[in-house]
């Protein structure tokens, strides 16, 4: 038996390394997101919604920073949710829900949250649905609460330079894959599919996403800020940037 079968923390570690191939400064991004929470809670224990939370990456870091936080993690992927559940145990409420429909909110254990965080996830949603989701998220935040979305968000004021940065990052990533020093996205999922415990859940995932996720859609920061403003948030802006990735925040 490999350690990945018995130990959810080994899966967490492998997921982190796989994701860092795409975003080497990923931890700095999480720090900026948690700093944003800290700015709105006035020292209180925060109630935080980890949206499209996957393996629980954000929840784990939130609890490390705010040990008394009330965490809710929402996702649809059964394999990633299994890793999250095993890692978080009773420190978070795990919710299975589809963000592609407005009904996802009915599964939440709380009516309002201090913060909603999401990272590298919402680019799977089409433009019209993402705009609707932004409006729904405003309604699950308390007045003064904050939403932070970190994702691939090119800087539309530097289109050519951004393209070159992305091309160079892809070349470096592919070189690491070729050298065997990092797992690619597909390699990680192949490993999960071969695991006796996770394999059946990966198979179930394929029934949920029979052709994989929908095509990725990565609009610039300006699109997100306009959509968040249209959703009714009182303040919107960028709280972090690293190359072609950024984190935008919106205050109810």
Model segments located where?
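Short alpha-helix
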Residues: 215-231
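Core SAM-dependent methyltransferase catalytic element
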Residues: 231-252
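Conserved class I S-adenosyl-L-methionine
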Residues: 1-43, 57-61, 148-184
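Short catalytic micro-motifs in class I SAM-dependent methyltransferases
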Residues: 120-124
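A short glycine-rich, Lys/Arg-flanked "PGG" loop and its adjoining helix->strand segment in the class I
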Residues: 131-143
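A conserved beta-strand element that flanks and buttresses the S-adenosyl-L-methionine
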Residues: 117
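Class I SAM-dependent methyltransferase SAM/SAH-binding core
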Residues: 49, 56-104
